[in-house]
Curated annotation (Swiss-Prot):
Alphabetical list of CDD domains matching this protein: Argininosuccinate_lyase
Subcellular location: Cytoplasm
Taxon lineage: Bacteria, Bacillati, Bacillota, Clostridia, Eubacteriales
Entry's Gene Ontology BP terms: arginine biosynthetic process via ornithine; L-arginine biosynthetic process
Catalytic activity: 2-(N(omega)-L-arginino)succinate = fumarate + L-arginine
Name of the protein: Argininosuccinate lyase
InterPro entries cross-referenced by the UniProt entry: Arg_succ_lyase_C, Argininosuccinate_lyase, Fumarase/histidase_N, Fumarate_lyase_CS, Fumarate_lyase_fam, Fumarate_lyase_N, L-Aspartase-like
Organism this protein belongs to: Clostridium botulinum (strain Langeland / NCTC 10281 / Type F)
Length: 440
């Protein structure tokens, strides 16, 4: 049974039927579809469009279908065009002809737009929850490992930071991601139900009522836009892509830091895998997969942008292609956030190797230049002097702090005994604005 066909002389080909069906993926929307129908039916009786006893039968049937799906009694499968026809046809089979009144004053165009918005809201809230859990772990692990480590530019050791402060940089990225998602929730918080196919309805339906019942701030202002808007899907996948970019950057650093060349951290066994041929291997596959899946979410974004780029108003069947990219991007970002939280919460940090890398990288060179500036030398001259000292140290295979005062004075008479305290790593990280890094 189809929800349409009266104006057709010939049957739809089986090839076209299969090609047209979206049930295999839009079945994810069964909960939202039924909840939207429940709200619609309650509105219909309030507006005296259907009778009270009809409403009761329809609501009971919808609630039974929802329960049967949740309990696995009713399988979402079969020869149905989409989740909307699956629910409606099963309702009619369950309660009889009164079920045919469910769709009064409604189109599948506003129905699917509603389903997707409800699903997008729920999905976004789930992503925000996962972000918060990851941010909590970053703070906790950072506070437990507030060790001095090299900070990098161009992947070259640059200045001293702390492991905690480095993790907090990612905390800031994810905090921005959370703000972006909350802003997106506010923008999409308008109900399209009641927009009809594109031009509303001749029935005096109450869009304000259904919007409130379904948790929306208000109904959409324009029917055409209500059924054809997919901006919120594009916006959310775009924001998911930024989250994935942040996760990928963090993954890259974790992969580097866990390598034998760095040995700053150990990734827990629970988030690593081995080699089928090399018994000694412990691979950071969790982080590598997150890094790889970032491109997958980018692909979802480009896919939906391409679908929407040339569509005239209002609804077009092209828009059926909005669901799989969104479902995939949402599932991917949630799984990656959960895995990253697991990786972070089980990290082991090698304090000694962090400090060894600090000692080898002339990470107090900027502070040594600042010392000369404080003694009256122009910064550009101080920069040159310290650069010459670094060359001298490299030739001697020593650090700046290992040079004697006599050696330092070969480069400038401004050096005094207090230079050693000034360029001490633990001391320098608590000078000036560096105190904001919170080393303790």
């Amino acid at each position: 049974m189809k929800l349409w066909g009266g104006r057709f002389k010939e049957e739809e080909s089986k090839l076209m039927e299969d090609f047209n069906s979206s049930l295999s993926f839009d079945k994810k929307l069964y909960y939202e579809d039924i909840k939207g129908s429940i709200a619609h039916v309650k509105m219909l009786v309030n507006q005296n469009i259907i009778k009270e006893e009809e409403k009761e039968k329809i609501l009971l049937g919808l609630e039974e279908i929802l329960k049967e799906i949740d309990e696995g009694i009713l399988k979402i499968e079969g020869d149905y065009e989409d989740i909307h026809s699956f629910v409606e046809i099963n309702l009619i089979n369950k309660i009889g002809n009164v079920g045919k009144k469910l769709h009064t004053g409604r189109s599948r165009n506003d129905q699917v737009a509603l389903d997707m918005k409800l699903y997008a809201k729920k999905s976004t809230e789930e992503v925000i929850k996962c972000l918060k859990e990851l941010m909590d772990s970053l703070i906790k692990v950072g506070n437990e490992n507030n060790y001095i480590m090299p900070g990098y530019t161009h992947l070259q050791r640059a200045q001293v930071v702390t492991f905690r402060y480095h993790l907090l940089a990612y905390f800031e990225m994810f905090k921005r991601d959370e703000k972006r998602l909350k802003n997106a929730l506010e923008i999409l918080n308008e109900s399209p139900l009641g927009s009809g196919a594109l031009a509303g309805s001749t029935y005096s339906i109450d869009r304000e009522y259904t919007a409130k019942l379904l948790g929306f701030r208000k109904p959409v202002d324009n029917f055409l836009d209500g059924v054809s808007d997919r901006d919120y899907i594009i916006e959310l996948i775009s924001k998911f892509s930024i989250i994935m970019m942040h996760l990928s950057r963090l993954s890259e650093e974790l992969i580097l830091w866990s390598s034998s060349e760095f040995r700053f951290i150990q990734i827990g066994d629970a988030y690593s895998t081995g080699s089928s041929i090399m018994p000694q291997k412990k691979n950071p596959d969790g982080a590598e997969l997150i890094r790889g899946k970032t491109g997958r979410v980018y692909g979802d974004l480009i896919g939906i942008l391409t679908v929407m780029k040339s569509l005239p108003l209002a609804y077009n069947k092209d828009m059926q292609e909005d669901k799989e990219p969104f479902f995939d991007a949402k599932d991917t970002v949630i799984s990656c956030l959960k895995v990253m939280e697991g990786i972070i919460s089980t990290l082991k940090v090698n304090k000694e190797n962090l400090m060894k890398s600090v000692k080898k990288g002339f990470l107090n060179a900027t502070e040594a230049a600042d010392y000369l500036v404080n003694k009256g030398m122009a910064f550009r001259d101080a920069h040159k002097v310290i650069g010459e000292i670094v060359i001298y140290c490299e030739d001697k295979n020593s650090a700046i702090e290992d040079l004697s005062l006599e050696e330092l004075k070969q480069f400038s008479d401004l050096f005094c005994e207090d230079i050693y305290g000034f360029i001490d790593y633990k001391s320098s990280i608590n000078k000036g604005i560096k105190k904001e890094m919170g080393y303790f």
